[in-house]
Amino acid sequence: MAQELMFEEPRRGKPPRHLADFDAEGRASAVAALGLPPFRAKQLAHQYYGRLIADPRQMTDLPAAVREQIAETMFPNLLTAAREVTCDAGQTRKTLWRATDGVTLESVLMRYPQRNTVCISSQAGCGMACPFCATGQGGLTRNLSTAEILEQVRAAAAALRDEFGDRLSNVVFMGMGEPLANYARVLAAVRRITEPPPMGFGISARSVTVSTVGLAPAIRKLADERLGVTLALSLHAPDDELRDTLVPVNNRWKISEALEAAHYYAEVTGRRVSVEYALIREVNDQPWRADLLGKRLHRALGPLVHVNLIPLNPTPGSDWDASPKPVEREFVKRVRAQGVSCTVRDTRGREISAACGQLAAEGG
């Protein structure tokens, strides 16, 4: 039986408030409520975003007498690493996190020669019900708070610095969940990821990618924020008949609406849109679908689009499989023939279920 779409999270308790949930005004108010001088707000933000410290007991520039109080009121331990697994000769690491209410989620840290990327979750589970995705099949548990999202980024940045003497360069909202279904918290997280310390982590907006299955009104809204992040549209089919099944949100917003919203995003931001297409053997890999994909994208976005073909990653209980390499090569050739840039994504983490569509937060 097909999963139902879920745009609203089930009602459940909220995570405790954390420094990372607050903007500058909120931090000032929280510090004032503790009876501390205003400069402590900036000091705490610098420790968290600049020095990547999440435990006030390690903040030696704070008076010892207030560290415990600050720890209890502004730095709850939101996420605990329940399990870590690695592959790709240690270059890919998947972390299973457990939140304070027992909810689990996953993030993936990937090291490349020229960049370091963390793939983060915006929801525990996902309500978009895509049948080829392990996360979507599990349903939506709840939205993550802004701080829970940012803690995944801070932990990755701290691990890179402490273990490898390196810096985090890229953040992709391609883990568990539909980012634009948790719009306000994801937006706040993006702002803090891109603002320079002490207001944020100082990662270039051009190095932040927000993916979506095609929530057209939210794509337009994100464009109007003018943040300059990369938009990744998970399309997976060029025709509504197939996409209605592969990406059920297509029953709400058709391909034409998603592409019109993507065009608006490209027009407003000047940024090229990335289109994600999981290539599934004998499902969406036919030559005519490659031709149609190229034509529709060229018509809608011109040069402001790039197609990432993703060989389907296996998920438990699924009979679907990745397309053979010759089919993949022909698909790329046909999309390019329509004047659209197209490459096959380097898939990392498949053997530890850390690749696209495999995150399910099981075990731990």
From Swiss-Prot:
Record key words, sorted: 4Fe-4S, Cytoplasm, Disulfide bond, Iron, Iron-sulfur, Metal-binding, Methyltransferase, rRNA processing, S-adenosyl-L-methionine, Transferase, tRNA processing
Radical SAM core domain segment(s): 112-350
GO BP term, example: rRNA base methylation
PANTHER family the record matches: 23S RRNA METHYLTRANSFERASE (PTHR30544), RADICAL SAM CORE DOMAIN-CONTAINING PROTEIN (PTHR30544:SF5)
Cofactor binding summary note: Binds 1 [4Fe-4S] cluster. The cluster is coordinated with 3 cysteines and an exchangeable S-adenosyl-L-methionine.
Cofactor(s) needed for function: [4Fe-4S] cluster
Disulfide bonds: 119-356
Record's keyword annotation contains Magnesium: no
Catalysed reactions listed for this entry: adenosine(2503) in 23S rRNA + 2 reduced [2Fe-2S]-[ferredoxin] + 2 S-adenosyl-L-methionine = 2-methyladenosine(2503) in 23S rRNA + 5'-deoxyadenosine + L-methionine + 2 oxidized [2Fe-2S]-[ferredoxin] + S-adenosyl-L-homocysteine; adenosine(37) in tRNA + 2 reduced [2Fe-2S]-[ferredoxin] + 2 S-adenosyl-L-methionine = 2-methyladenosine(37) in tRNA + 5'-deoxyadenosine + L-methionine + 2 oxidized [2Fe-2S]-[ferredoxin] + S-adenosyl-L-homocysteine
Active site annotation, chain numbering: 106, 356
Gene: rlmN
Binding-site residues for S-adenosyl-L-methionine, renumbered to this chain: 177-178, 211, 234-236, 313
Gene Ontology cellular component annotations, sorted alphabetically: cytoplasm
Misc: Reaction proceeds by a ping-pong mechanism involving intermediate methylation of a conserved cysteine residue.
InterPro entries with a match to the protein in the record: Aldolase_TIM, Elp3/MiaA/NifB-like_rSAM, Methyltransferase_A, RNA_MTrfase_RlmN, rRNA_lsu_MTrfase_RlmN/Cfr, rSAM
Residues reported to bind [4Fe-4S] cluster: 126, 130, 133
Lineage: Bacteria, Bacillati, Actinomycetota, Actinomycetes, Mycobacteriales
Protein role: Specifically methylates position 2 of adenine 2503 in 23S rRNA and position 2 of adenine 37 in tRNAs.
Protein name (database record): Probable dual-specificity RNA methyltransferase RlmN
One protein family per Pfam: Radical_SAM
GO molecular function ontology, one term from the record: tRNA (adenine(37)-C2)-methyltransferase activity
HAMAP family: RNA_methyltr_RlmN
Main location class: cytoplasm
This protein's record includes keyword Metal-binding: yes
Location of this chain's protein in the cell: Cytoplasm
Species, as recorded: Mycobacterium marinum (strain ATCC BAA-535 / M)
